[in-house]
Curated annotation (Swiss-Prot):
Record-given protein name: Major capsid protein L1
Any one of the GO BP annotations: virion attachment to host cell
Annotated Basic residues bias: 537-548, 558-568
One annotated GO molecular function: structural molecule activity
Keyword Disulfide bond carried by entry: yes
Gene expressing this chain: L1
Predominant location: virion
């Protein structure tokens, strides 16, 4: 029914004709005539609209709802909020100085010398291109003798250390240490070569030495720093590798330990599994793993324990350009070159490798032997030393001089030089000094704080003598009295005690500072710098001198001179 007819029906009270409870009754004649006339008018309107191809009266359309065909995205799940340590750690006004003694190490710069042949003990490998990872042990502040015991309540609070300043002292003069290989895989000088060697079957290795990339690095945190390197991956079973095929690569993350090799300019990779010739790189890394700090992962650490802050400086350039001898595993496509008519007719080795160099060594851009103050860490941990420990990862290749030592095989020393009568040795020495400023902080043990710390690291509460009881058991357990007796069945071996130290199997340089804390900041170089930086005044050690009391024989005040007028 058209809209016009509906209006007329409502106007002339004809709506009851369509009601279900309507009882028929006679209608007036004029009402029936009016109703028929308007129905005819609506029919003419419909015929008029049907003559148009693309036009249809809107009152004959029906609205139909259809669901959208687009993808419906659900809201992302909520992310657990990580709280900054400043929100629940309250600093105090008490600062301590702690410093290590002079830390020295000596060894062979290229490899470890095993015991034997006159050596009663192994000579370690000590190179300037190794990570030095110091694990600094701090005293427990909750068991520490404090000058003021009213700064915290042991029933509702706990004490922690926060690192406020650090200075890493570095000894020994600047120098350039060389590394090399007596059988280095060096084929051609591809920078200035006139004729390349195409077919090589004999041994063309040579004795080559290089100076590595310069690196200065310092990472401070309460957890070990994380490194990355490329290692040999696992091939799929559907695509097995044949002998001589290039193995797949896999990026691995490991903890940076003391003695690990840094990136020297040849890449961060496992050379022991990815280079079977043992002559592609110098001696000190040909069977080692060179690691590079994974700054991306440490920066993304939700709690920020592995890196409070970091300092780094790297410098490198290529000195020589060589290629490698051997069969090319990846053949050069013929579309990339035109065959020659003379020698060489086919392309030679296309595996190119530079010799790295760190260039000039200078003291103008040194990162060490200067203080650093920690005001705001890059992560959520603002210098709080959980578990009363601190990890300092250091690399400094600027004082990398290798000492050459020669000893005569005859006594006395022969008067005429003969190289066969002298033994040559190489040693590398390193010298460090660690100085810290620690601030004493308190943590109020509310339910929310303890719940958050337990979710972050439950072992922290265990160190504070808080434990979670195991769930009660309802089963009956048999307990024998004489466990070692042969009269009873063999009992199960007791479970080994859990190792509370998660870094027990890792290698670090342990530095114990539990007995080297001092409140006398002005007695140490770093402490005096901190007092100046913080605007604090040092405590007077010598009191002011007292004025001497006046003696009993003190003369009286001189009388004033009286002027006498002369008489006229």
């Amino acid at each position: 029914m058209c809209l016009y007819t509906r209006v007329l029906i409502l106007h002339y009270h004809l709506l009851p004709l369509y009601g279900p409870l309507y009882h028929p009754r006679p209608l007036p004649l004029h009402s029936i005539l009016v109703y028929m006339v308007h129905i005819i008018i609506c029919g003419h309107y419909i015929i008029l609209f049907l003559r148009n191809v693309n036009v249809f009266p809107i009152f004959l359309q029906m609205a139909l709802w259809r669901p959208s065909d687009n993808t419906v995205y659900l809201p992302p799940p909520s992310v657990a909020r990580v709280v900054n340590t400043d929100d629940y750690v309250t600093p105090t006004s008490i600062f301590y100085h702690a410093g290590s003694s002079r830390l020295l190490t000596v060894g062979n710069p290229y490899f470890r010398v095993p015991a034997g042949g006159g050596n009663k003990q192994d000579i370690p490998k000590v190179s300037a291109y190794q990570y030095r990872v110091f694990r600094v042990q701090l005293p427990d502040p909750n068991k520490f003798g404090l000058p003021d015991t009213s700064i915290y309540n042991p029933e509702t609070q706990r004490l922690v250390w926060a690192c406020a300043g650090v200075e890493i002292g570095r000894g020994q003069p600047l120098g350039v240490g060389l590394s090399g290989h007596p059988f280095y895989n060096k084929l051609d000088d591809t920078e200035s070569s006139h004729a390349a060697t195409s077919n090589v079957s004999e041994d063309v290795r040579d004795n080559v030495s290089v100076d590595y990339k310069q690196t200065q690095l310092c990472i401070l945190g309460c957890a070990p720093a994380i490194g990355e390197h490329w290692a040999k991956g696992t091939a799929c079973k559907s695509r097995p590798l044949s002998q001589g095929d290039c193995p797949p690569l896999e990026l691995k993350n490991t903890v940076l330990e003391d003695g690990d090799m840094v990136d020297t300019g040849y890449g961060a990779m496992d050379f022991s599994t990815l280079q079977d010739t043992k002559c592609e790189v110098p001696l000190d890394i040909c069977q080692s793993i060179c690691k590079y700090p994974d700054y991306l992962q440490m920066s993304a650490d939700p709690y920020g324990d592995s890196m409070f802050f970091c300092l780094r400086r790297e410098q490198l350039f290529a000195r020589h350009f060589w290629n490698r001898a051997g069969t090319m595993g990846d053949t050069v496509p013929q579309s990339l070159y035109i065959k020659g008519t003379g020698m060489p007719a086919s392309p030679g080795s296309c595996v190119y490798s530079p010799s790295p160099s760190g260039s000039i060594v200078t003291s103008d851009s040194q990162l060490f032997n200067k203080p650093y103050w920690l005001h705001k860490a890059q992560g959520h941990n603002n210098g709080v030393c959980w578990h009363n420990q601190l990890f300092v990862t250091v690399v400094d290749t600027t004082p990398s001089t290798n000492l050459t030592i020669c000893a005569s095989t005859q006594s006395p020393v022969p008067g005429q030089y003969d190289a066969t009568k002298f033994k040559q040795y190489s040693r590398h020495v390193e010298e460090y000094d660690l100085q810290f400023i620690f601030q004493l902080c308190t943590i109020t043990l509310t339910a929310d704080v303890m719940s958050y710390i337990h979710s972050m690291n439950s072992s922290i509460l265990e160190d504070w003598n808080f434990g979670v009881p195991p769930p009660p058991t309802t089963s009956l357990v048999d307990t024998y009295r004489f466990v070692q007796s042969v009269a009873i069945t063999c009992q199960k071996d007791a479970a080994p005690a859990e190792n509370k130290d998660p870094y027990d199997k890792l290698k670090f340089w342990n530095v114990d500072l539990k007995e080297k804390f001092s409140l006398d900041l002005d007695q140490y170089p770093l402490g005096r710098k901190f007092l100046v930086q913080a605007g604090l005044r040092r405590k007077p050690t010598i009191g002011p001198r007292k004025r001497s009391a006046p003696s009993a024989t003190t003369s009286s005040k001189p009388a004033k001179r009286v002027r006498v007028r002369a008489r006229k």
